[in-house]
Amino acid sequence: MVDQSKLFNVSDECYDCGCDLKPACADREGKKMKVRVQRLHENAKLPVRAHPTDAGMDLFFCPAPRDDIPKQIESVLPHGSSLFPTGLKIEVPEGYMLEIKNKSGISSKRGLIVGACVVDRGYTGEIFVNLHNPSDRTQTLHAGDKIAQAVFVKITTDVQLVESDSIYDDETSRGDGALGSTGDR
């Protein structure tokens, strides 16, 4: 049984349509979607939204407490990657995924970049954040530091891919222009 005090509000309003119709949005109470979160240990911090209008909720580096290590730190070696535990399980609602994104301060000040970042509805384990360090300097994080942000994204899995010999019968103004095709200025 989940302790109701450990539930948090994902947003102030419905992201996908703004409605509060219970038949259409059965997982919502009023306008706030409730998402269950489980702390795996007492030091785990719940995700927090710094401002009510922020899309993302901050995630924290929260390893399980160890008596033999009073202050836990983790280093990401130059050009290396490390997995950072959050100490949380988050139940992703039906029709959504949880996307783990860079925090601007972590990526711009420390150069740490989030790796594989999709948490599917079917995943039931602890949320880990994969941080990559493309710099030439070791980066160190302490337990309790902000490491990334989590964003709930509406998705559809009601898709069937159908193989075709040609998919674009009409020309578009972009065509097959890829990265950098519009120039720098």
Question: What feature does the model see in each segment?
Answer:
Residues K22:
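Short functional micro-motifs and their immediate structural scaffolds
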